[in-house]
Amino acid sequence: MVSTATQIGHFSFDNCLMNAAGVYCMTKEELMEVEKSQAASFVTKTGTLEVRPGNPEPRYADTRLGSINSMGLPNNGFRYYLDFVSDLAKTGQHKPHFLSVVGLSPTETETILKAIMASDYEGLVELNLSCPNVPGKPQIAYDFETTDQLLENIFTYYTKPLGIKLPPYFDIVHFDQAAAIFNKYPLSFVNCVNSIGNGLVIEDEQVLIKPKNGFGGIGGDYIKPTALANVHAFYKRLKPSIHIIGTGGVKTGRDAFEHILCGASMVQIGTVLHQEGPAIFERVTKELKTIMVEKGYQRLADFRGNLRYKD
């Protein structure tokens, strides 16, 4: 029997597919739709210290090759999501989940994570170091010194399972530098990647979205080669205890297969989930299993990270 079961940290999942933070995860109702689908788990909207309305609309647009957005981290506040995942866990009948959070300053991040430490929640936390769409706030993980200092401080008080959502890197030296930092800490996972920041899509002489004069994060087909490169680069550089979640350009079982081939333990779906809804997980799971059967693979470990190079 072909299995797409996987593991992140000490958490086991019966499938390897889930939503990407930002899609189908704003409300409890949306999260429960993902929960009831064939997705392995869900990740919440990235929760900030306070409720955020996000950027002015229109702030999202589908395009021929994917999507562009400048949402600006709209969310119901981290406590809304923390209370929800904590309550779900208490029922004992639900999947392990991911709680996505970030502060708009190091002090806010510390306040949020200390609140999670003091809570009953024992699941996975994804710290978003890579949102490109908050005006005046840089993507933290592009500043290696700040990232190192932030993680060093976090792990003086935070002992629950924690991973980080990364922006795309484009330089081999940056892969080396980032991995050297991440390997210093007891991270459960890294998520590669968030959208490619500050793209521009034009239609009939006009930008598609309002914030930042049309500049926004690019997702979908545009990002898949970059996402695969980041997944594989970090798979080769990170210690085995740090699992990799692959995100970017996944709309078919073949796309998911390639992420796993590059080293991903789980795969997140964003743009196409927004377009098709949670039924996407059943289709992509079926397509992935078909590929595995054709190639003679019984489980993800049979091919994870086994990308072949040209001689």
UniProtKB/Swiss-Prot annotation:
Pathway note: Pyrimidine metabolism; UMP biosynthesis via de novo pathway
Q: How does it assemble?
A: Homodimer.
Report what the protein is called: Putative dihydroorotate dehydrogenase A (fumarate)
Q: How is the cofactor bound?
A: Binds 1 FMN per subunit.
Catalysis: reaction(s): (S)-dihydroorotate + fumarate = orotate + succinate
- Name the Pfam families on file: DHO_dh (PF01180)
- Catalytic site positions: 131
Which keywords belong to this entry? Cytoplasm, Flavoprotein, FMN, Oxidoreductase, Pyrimidine biosynthesis
Annotated compartments: Cytoplasm
Q: Which InterPro entries match?
A: Aldolase_TIM, DHO_dehydrogenase, DHOD_1A, Dihydroorotate_DH_1, Dihydroorotate_DH_1_2, Dihydroorotate_DH_cat, Dihydroorotate_DH_CS
| Major localization listed first in the record, in broad terms | cytoplasm
Q: For this protein, what is the EC number?
A: 1.3.98.1
Can you supply one Gene Ontology CC term for this chain's record? cytoplasm
GO MF assignments: dihydroorotate dehydrogenase (fumarate) activity
Q: Name one GO biological process term.
A: 'de novo' pyrimidine nucleobase biosynthetic process
General function of this protein: Catalyzes the conversion of dihydroorotate to orotate with fumarate as the electron acceptor.
The protein's required cofactors: FMN
Which amino acids does the record list as binding FMN? 45-46, 128, 165, 193, 220, 248-249, 270-271
Q: Which residues bind substrate?
A: 45, 69-73, 128, 194-195
Checking PROSITE patterns in the record gives: DHODEHASE_2
Family to which the UniProt record says this protein belongs: Belongs to the dihydroorotate dehydrogenase family. Type 1 subfamily.
Species: Streptococcus pyogenes serotype M18 (strain MGAS8232)
Which top EC class is given?
oxidoreductase
